[in-house]
């Protein structure tokens, strides 16, 4: 049973004379030396989202805007210095500006709807007037003070509001304006308050809601910040007005995000919130540090709201459930989905209904704290953007191109009222549900069934019981598991609530919860029918739809080999894994994803102490990853191997997530490494050694090379992610450290770049028979198809430019992807020396030369050699060039160990240890944009490891099929098992 702390607070009722004026001594707005928030347009892909989150963008405002493939335009809200830093990481930004003419026209067309909180005719005065003019239905009170001492006002709306005890009726909270710039949200709650008052006694539905429940309205949860957005240059301020450094000024380094400051999961990681005061998602110096946070927390504890809606903008989403961990369903999602709807059937037209963390995460937010600390089920609508609503009437004066930002909802009574009206059905359905909180009044007709079983078709139980799970309405009594084995008599077991796992579970279970019981005495080959029964709160019998599973024949043992080779053909390498386990005295069962599908965490994985999950050529599915995540969460131990291990999975529609790799496997980033010859263990795998080679029919082209999560998220601050390097590829430099020595030449990715590393080679005394060549080591990580490395050459003084192929076969003549669309050649017209656009593709030759390039990932350092015989007797300028398009990119291009070869003898070696030597950086050719960064000497960007260990997992960047020696395979598995069971 959920226990809710009761705070006994003295709360002042406020009428006209009851509000104390805010203190006069406050931090003042920054002057000319301060940086304001500026709107920027960026063309980005989902792969670049982590850079935007690091810069402080809110994932919930961005995620829906990014397509599964390619890139899209988004708005960012950054200072100029923040934008410069982001631009330095390769994101192409352009300041968004609205012409003075358009701004003046819109100002003249505006209806004057939006008003500050304080001051004459402000929202605060309207709130007080509402309490005075509706004494039988409304009561106004302060729930606390802001940083600057303003009252945060709440309106209680119910029959006999001033006489009834707060929280004595089922209560709903309508909350808005946590983020200062989201002006449409106070209009939503303000209008909703008046909608109830105006229709009371006229509309039976409204009258019933007001008579039987309490409706509370906090029209501005951030009055200081909201007022600040009405001052010059501060329209896009998001946070509260905490003066973080105490200098008496408000600059971009001040303020705390009120929706990242709540104690529940506060600072769980640095993706869902930021430790940086300049970030828009700065979480504050400590959990619950802000007075605005304290006010809402104590308010929720005092009133005990059943439901709440926390209005935000601007993204056209309707969010609910877990925010702190990606794609995590909960028992209460049954109700959330019934009320919010689905992506295909949303409760608010035009919005996308989904779990808060469907793609990206937040932590310390109001919703999670409300549910898991204060027992309040809270939704977050992200209301419509300026761009969207400005399109609705082509005949009006509002044009999407004139939007200063998507937060600048048009000052149009017609558009604001339309946005409000489409939100009414959802708002009313939530209030109605408060009266019977576990039986939702869905506005879209979606039921909330009493039972939702966790079904599966195959059980791998052997000599133990099979646990089954079901999500059940908590008010159902006599919750019972029923089952029959092979059609025999009915057996029953009492269902017990699941307490949760090591990381998640046991939360977000206010009205529904997961319950479990065990099926006993089923043997291999048996068919078991399962269903669940109980009695409703009214005493009526209720039951689930039955499901049936078969107990499979499988070897006795505590380890499962999870074969995940990709495709639909049966696994080829599973026997290598079972043999290595057998050599360690362990019998193993096998589950083949290709032929058996996704394994059930309960039906299959739970019956094993260890799972050895190996991957093949294909990226593992999200469904398999989630099953393995459930297994580890419930105490299982995991060994994960293969080239695809420790990378990203596709959550759907091209949305890649590496959260499982980062937070469960300890691999913060992954790169590929081509054909490492050996592995040497370290740390908990110390002493393990293995020679590596290609597997039959499959070369080792991209062995995993990982950075360690604990190197980024330090264990003293993030002990839950403790991880360590457990081995290397000896003698191999990983892709982003020098091939030799301590320095190399690096062209780190920037969008729209044409970076040249050039030198002149004097071949006036050479002959073609001497086979002159330029040799170098090259490592690159580019957006496949779209960005490239080319080696350009021309005779000094002539315009006979061409690109040179790699004599070692590393280059290709394929034209850039979508070259025919023209955007790449428009950005870099010099490329027409080598490319000719066509109707469906570009030809690999141009006005003076041929096209040869490197694209994608080199998976480590490659030896490259280009033939210079055509320039014998001349001087030739050669350039290693990194050329990128306007969209996303990889890490860039890297060069080391350059040398000239003439007659088989190398000379003029340059490894960039002290200088660029004969090389120079001439900048982009005429017609290309200027580079925001260029080639430069660099030390290692980072070191990557071949294996990683955590408390519960061991990760290898290669598979046992890449280990020719059975003895080595045995020892690797032995070390991994020992590391997991110390």
Feature names for model-found ranges:
Residues 1-27:
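Secretory targeting and sorting signals
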Residues 687-755, 784, 802-862, 910-944:
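Extracellular glycan-recognition surfaces and repeat-rich motifs
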Residues 786-788, 859, 884-902, 966-970:
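Extracellular carbohydrate recognition
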């Amino acid at each position: 049973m959920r226990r809710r702390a009761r705070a006994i607070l003295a709360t002042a009722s406020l009428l006209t004379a009851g509000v104390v004026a805010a203190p006069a001594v406050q931090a003042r707005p920054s002057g000319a030396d301060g940086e304001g928030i500026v709107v920027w347009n960026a063309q980005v892909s989902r792969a670049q989202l982590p850079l935007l989150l690091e810069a402080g963008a809110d994932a919930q405002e961005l995620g829906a805007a990014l397509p599964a493939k390619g890139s899209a335009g988004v708005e960012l809200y950054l200072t100029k210095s923040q934008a410069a830093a982001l631009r330095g990481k390769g994101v192409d930004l352009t300041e968004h500006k609205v012409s003075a003419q358009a701004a003046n026209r819109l100002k003249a067309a505006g209806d004057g709807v939006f008003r500050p909180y304080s001051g004459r005719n402000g929202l605060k005065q309207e709130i007080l007037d509402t309490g005075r003019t509706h004494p039988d239905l409304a009561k106004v009170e302060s729930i606390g003070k802001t940083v600057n001492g303003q009252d945060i006002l709440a309106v209680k709306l119910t029959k006999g509001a001033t006489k009834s005890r707060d929280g004595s009726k089922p209560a709903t909270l309508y909350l808005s304006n946590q983020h200062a710039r989201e002006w449409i949200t106070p209009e939503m709650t303000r209008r909703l308050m008046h909608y109830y008052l105006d229709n009371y006694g006229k509309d039976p539905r409204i009258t019933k809601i007001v008579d039987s429940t309490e409706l509370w309205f906090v029209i501005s949860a951030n009055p200081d910040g909201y007022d600040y957005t009405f001052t010059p240059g501060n329209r896009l301020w998001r946070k509260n007005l905490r003066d973080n450094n105490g200098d008496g000024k408000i600059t971009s380094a001040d303020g705390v995000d009120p929706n990242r400051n709540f104690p529940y999961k506060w600072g769980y990681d640095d993706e869902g919130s930021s430790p940086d005061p300049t970030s828009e998602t700065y979480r504050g110096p400590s959990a619950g540090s802000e007075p605005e946070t304290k006010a809402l927390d104590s308010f929720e504890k005092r009133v005990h709201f059943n439901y709440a809606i926390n209005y935000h903008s601007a993204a056209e989403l309707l969010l609910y459930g877990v925010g702190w961990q990606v794609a995590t369903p909960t028992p209460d999602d049954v109700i959330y989905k019934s009320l919010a709807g689905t992506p295909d059937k949303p409760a608010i037209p035009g919005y996308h209904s989904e779990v808060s963390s469907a793609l990206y995460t937040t932590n310390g937010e109001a919703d999670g704290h409300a549910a898991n600390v204060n027992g309040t089920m809270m939704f977050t609508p992200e209301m419509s953007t300026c761009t969207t609503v400005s399109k609705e009437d082509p005949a009006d004066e509002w044009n999407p191109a004139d939007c200063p930002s998507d937060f600048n909802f048009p000052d149009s009574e017609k558009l604001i009222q339309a946005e409000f009206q489409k939100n009414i059905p959802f708002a009313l359905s939530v209030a109605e549900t408060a009266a019977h909180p576990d039986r939702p009044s869905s506005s879209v007709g979606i039921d909330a069934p009493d039972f939702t079983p966790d079904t599966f078709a195959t059980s791998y139980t052997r000599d133990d019981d099979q646990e089954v799970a079901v999500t059940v309405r908590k008010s159902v009594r006599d919750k019972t598991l029923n089952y029959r084995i092979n059609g025999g008599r009915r057996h029953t077991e009492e269902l017990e609530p699941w307490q949760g796992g090591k990381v998640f579970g046991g939360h977000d279970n206010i009205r529904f919860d997961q319950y479990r019981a065990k099926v006993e005495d089923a043997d291999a080959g048996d068919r078991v029918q399962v269903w669940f029964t109980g009695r409703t709160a009214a005493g009526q019998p209720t039951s689930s739809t039955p499901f049936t599973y078969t107990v499979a024949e499988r070897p006795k043992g505590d380890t499962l080999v999870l074969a995940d080779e990709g495709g639909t053909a049966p696994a080829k390498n599973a026997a290598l894994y079972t043999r290595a386990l057998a050599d360690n005295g362990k019998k193993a069962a096998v589950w083949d994803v290709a032929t058996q599908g996704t394994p059930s965490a309960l039906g299959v994985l739970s019956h094993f102490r260890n799972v050895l999950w190996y991957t093949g050529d294909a990226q593992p599915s999200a469904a398999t990853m989630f099953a393995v995540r459930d297994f580890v969460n419930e105490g299982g131990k995991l060994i994960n191997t293969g080239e695809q291990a420790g990378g990203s999975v596709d959550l759907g529609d091209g949305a890649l997530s590496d959260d499982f790799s980062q937070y469960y496997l300890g691999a913060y980033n992954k790169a590929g490494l081509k054909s490492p010859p050996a592995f040497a263990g370290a740390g908990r795998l110390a002493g393990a050694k293995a020679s590596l080679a290609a597997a039959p029919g499959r070369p080792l082209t991209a062995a995993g090379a990982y950075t360690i999560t604990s190197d980024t998220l330090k264990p003293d601050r993030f002990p839950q992610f403790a991880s360590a390097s457990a081995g290397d590829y000896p003698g191999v430099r990983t892709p982003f450290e020098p091939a030799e020595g301590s320095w190399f030449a690096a062209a780190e990715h920037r969008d729209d770049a044409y970076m040249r590393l050039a030198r002149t080679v004097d071949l006036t005394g050479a002959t073609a028979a001497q086979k002159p060549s330029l040799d170098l080591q090259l490592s690159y990580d580019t957006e496949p198809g779209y960005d490239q490395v080319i080696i350009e050459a021309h005779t000094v003084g002539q315009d006979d430019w061409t690109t040179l192929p790699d004599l070692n076969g590393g280059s290709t003549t394929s034209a850039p992807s979508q070259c025919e669309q023209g955007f790449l050649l428009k950005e870099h017209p010099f490329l027409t020396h080598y490319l000719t656009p066509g109707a469906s593709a570009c030809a690999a030759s141009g006005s003076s030369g041929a096209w040869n390039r490197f694209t994608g990932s080199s998976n480590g350092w490659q030896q490259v050699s280009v033939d210079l015989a055509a320039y014998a007797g001349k001087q030739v300028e050669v350039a290693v060039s990194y050329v990128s398009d306007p969209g996303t990119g990889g890490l860039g291009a890297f060069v080391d160990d350059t040398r000239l070869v003439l007659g088989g003898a190398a000379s003029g070696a340059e490894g960039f240890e002290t200088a660029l030597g004969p090389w120079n950086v001439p900048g982009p050719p005429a017609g290309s944009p200027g580079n925001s960064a260029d080639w430069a000497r660099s030390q290692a960007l980072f070191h990557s490891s071949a294996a990683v260990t955590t408390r519960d997992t061991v990760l290898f960047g290669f598979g046992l099929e890449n280990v020719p020696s059975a003895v080595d395979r045995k020892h690797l598995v032995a070390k991994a098992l020992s590391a997991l069971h110390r």
